[in-house]
Amino acid sequence: MPEINTSHLDEQQVQLLAEMCILIDENDNKIGADTKKNCHLNENIDKGLLHRAFSVFLFNTENKLLLQQRSDAKITFPGCFTNSCCSHPLSNPGELEENDAIGVKRAAQRRLKAELGIPLEEVDPNEMHYLTRIYYKAQSDGIWGEHEIDYILFLKKNVTLNPDPNEIKSYCYVSKEELKELVKKAASGEVKLTPWFKIIVDTFLFKWWDNLNHLSQFVDHEKIHRM
C-alpha cells in the first residue's frame, strides 16, 4: 500500500484512519477488511478497493432534514454540506451482521453519537428505515477519495444535538425549499456539497421526503443503484 505523509492533517482525524472498514465486491459481498486510510486513497480506489458505508437522513417531527457542514479538519470533503451523518460500519461482529442491515444501523447509532452527540438511548437502530443502496466513486483531492456502496437510512424523530466541532463545522434543519436554495448556492460555487449527497438530492431525496410516512414503497434491498 502507498505511504502517505499525514503529519499535516488533524491528529484526531488521523487516528480514525486506523479503523477497519469492511471490504466488499461490487455486489456488496464481504471480502475482507482494510484501514479507513487505505480505503480512501485514490491509488487504491483506482485498483478497485471498495468498502461499505451508510448515509443517515434524520428528520424532525416538522419534517425538516438535519444537514451538517463537515469540519475543516475532515480529511475527505472538508467544509462540504451533507446529509445528517455519513460514515462506515467497522469490521467487528456487531457491525458486520447483515440481517435487516442491523450492523450498518448499529454503526449509524455509534456515529450519530460521535459526530452529533445524540445520546445512544435516543436512537434505537431498529427505528431506522433501511431503504436501498447506492454505489458511487468520487475524488476529494489528488490523494483522497471515496469508493463505496452506501446504505440509505431514514429516521424521523426529535433528538438532542451536541455536535463535536472536530467533526462538524455547522448544522441546521432545512425544509425542502431551503435545501433547494442550498443546491442553487452550490451550483454557483458559493458552497460545496459532498458528492454522495448531491447524487442522492438529484435522484431520490425529494421523492422520499414527500413520502416520509409511507417509505415502505421505496424499500429495495435487492438493487444497488450504480451512479
Curated annotation (Swiss-Prot):
For this protein, the record's SUPFAM superfamilies field holds:
Nudix
Choose one Gene Ontology CC annotation of this protein and give it.
Answer: peroxisome
Record key words, sorted: Acetylation, Cholesterol biosynthesis, Cholesterol metabolism, Isomerase, Isoprene biosynthesis, Lipid biosynthesis, Lipid metabolism, Magnesium, Metal-binding, Peroxisome, Steroid biosynthesis, Steroid metabolism, Sterol biosynthesis, Sterol metabolism
Listed EC numbers: 5.3.3.2
Q: For this protein, what does the record note about how its cofactor is bound?
A: Binds 1 Mg(2+) ion per subunit.
Show where the Nudix hydrolase domain sits.
49-199
Its domain of life reads Eukaryota
One Pfam family name from the record?
NUDIX
Q: Which residues carry this modification: N6-acetyllysine?
A: 176
Q: Which terms under GO biological process does the entry name? A: cholesterol biosynthetic process; dimethylallyl diphosphate biosynthetic process; isopentenyl diphosphate biosynthetic process
Q: What class of enzyme is it?
A: isomerase
Cofactors needed by this protein, per the record, are: Mg(2+)
Q: Name one GO molecular function term.
A: isopentenyl-diphosphate delta-isomerase activity
**Where does the record place the catalytic residues?**
86, 148
Q: Which family does it belong to?
A: Belongs to the IPP isomerase type 1 family.
Identify this protein by name. Answer: Isopentenyl-diphosphate Delta-isomerase 1
